[in-house]
Amino acid sequence: MSERAAVSSERITAIQQRLAEGLAKIDPHHRLLGRPLSYRVIDGRMLEITYRDVAGIAEAEVLGVKRILGRDCYCTVAPQTAESVTVRFVVPLE
């Protein structure tokens, strides 16, 4: 494994741990906790975190997650079905 890949792997693990611990504190209504979740590395430089089947999410909740992930993170919320949305966060790995 290259040094860059090892650093990225460590950073991804740190982001996943920080997100799990942070959501436990800021998501009392379980809007994101327990939802289908996927991670995808984009070009080895960014980590996309996607939550599916989210019943709805307030801007304040998105801002809370962004505080956990870091200020360089950005988010999109898109309709998935009439009753749910998909929430994506993208975090730089560098």
Language-model features: locations:
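Short intrinsically disordered terminal tails
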Residues: 1-13, 92-94
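Short amphipathic alpha-helix segments
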Residues: 9-32, 58-69
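Short secondary-structure junctions
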Residues: 29-38, 70-78
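Short, charged/polar, Gly/Pro-enriched secondary-structure boundary elements
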Residues: 56-59, 93-94
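C-terminal edge-of-domain segments
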Residues: 75-94
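Short glycine-rich, basic-tinged beta-strand/loop micro-motifs
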Residues: 33-56, 86
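A generic structural signal for short, non-catalytic loop/turn and secondary-structure boundary residues
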Residues: 42, 68, 80-82
